[in-house]
């Protein structure tokens, strides 16, 4: 059974689909890099999976009894208190529901703080942005999530911290879905690629470098297919302007087909950087 199921997810802003009936599965142990141009909705998708954003339609379902944790891109401005308290707070719900004892929460918090190379007694406000990110990662991991969602995890980190994070995530046994602009980090951590492009969420069962090759081939094929479609549409537009032939009963099917082609062309979302052809 899949760890996470996305079923016909749709979300639009100002009439533009960020997600258009997206359906995908995440299996345990996968480390998925989520790619897409700026503004395509990658962070929105992570927030949707985390339960912080409602879709217009469709569902995100985490397998029964499984947990997900989300590390946002920016450090919250209201984050305060000692490192130990900030991390332990993530376990407060489990303690209140009797899932774990208070002493267990304390032990778990201390263990993950030590693993992150942090000082439990330091006030988080005195830390650098990179160290604050480590605290937030510790808070995300202390709940022992089955699925970890990371939005730009290398932001504000120095090279040493990035190398540490890469090694940690590469050896971590959980499942990972993350967004990053750091291609080196992506190459070393991801074993699968998801891409969000013009509302479509595609899955590529390969690492990043192989994805680049396959994606280039797919875009080339798309361009050729669109060029053939546009040529055929232009020919049909010339035909319809002839007038009398199009009004004959036996040509009604051809007229309907032309109307359908016009609609398909109108709805096409061009590759980023491509101009829309008006006919």
Regions found by a protein language model. Name each.
Residues 1-226:
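ABC ATP-binding cassette signature C-motif
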Residues 4, 97-105, 219-279:
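Flexible nucleotide-interacting loop at or near the entrance of a catalytic core
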């Amino acid at each position: 059974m899949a760890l996470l199921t996305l079923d016909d997810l749709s979300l639009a802003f100002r009439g533009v689909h960020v997600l258009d009936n997206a359906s995908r599965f995440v299996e345990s142990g996968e480390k998925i890099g989520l790619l897409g141009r700026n503004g395509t909705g990658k962070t929105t998708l992570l927030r949707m999976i985390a339960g912080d954003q409602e879709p217009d339609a469709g569902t995100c379902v985490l397998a029964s009894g499984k947990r997900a944790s989300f590390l946002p891109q920016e450090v919250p401005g209201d984050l305060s208190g000692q490192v130990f308290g900030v991390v332990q707070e993530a376990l407060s719900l489990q303690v209140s529901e009797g899932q774990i004892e208070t002493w267990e929460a304390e032990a778990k918090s201390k263990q993950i703080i030590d693993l992150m190379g942090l000082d439990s007694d330091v006030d988080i406000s005195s830390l650098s942005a990179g160290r604050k990110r480590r605290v937030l990662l510790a808070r995300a991991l202390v709940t022992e999530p089955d699925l970890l969602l990371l939005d730009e995890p290398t932001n504000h980190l120095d090279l040493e911290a990035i190398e540490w994070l890469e090694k940690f995530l590469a050896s971590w046994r959980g499942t990972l879905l993350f967004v990053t602009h750091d291609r080196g980090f992506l190459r070393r951590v991801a074993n699968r690629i998801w891409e969000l492009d013009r509302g479509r969420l595609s899955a590529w069962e390969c690492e990043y470098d192989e994805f680049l090759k396959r994606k280039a081939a797919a875009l080339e094929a798309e361009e050729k297919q669109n060029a053939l479609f546009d040529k055929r549409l232009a020919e049909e537009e010339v035909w319809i302007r002839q007038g009398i032939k199009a009004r004959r009963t036996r040509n009604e099917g051809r007229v309907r087909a032309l109307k359908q082609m016009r609609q398909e062309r109108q709805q096409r979302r061009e590759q980023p950087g491509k101009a829309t052809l008006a006919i």
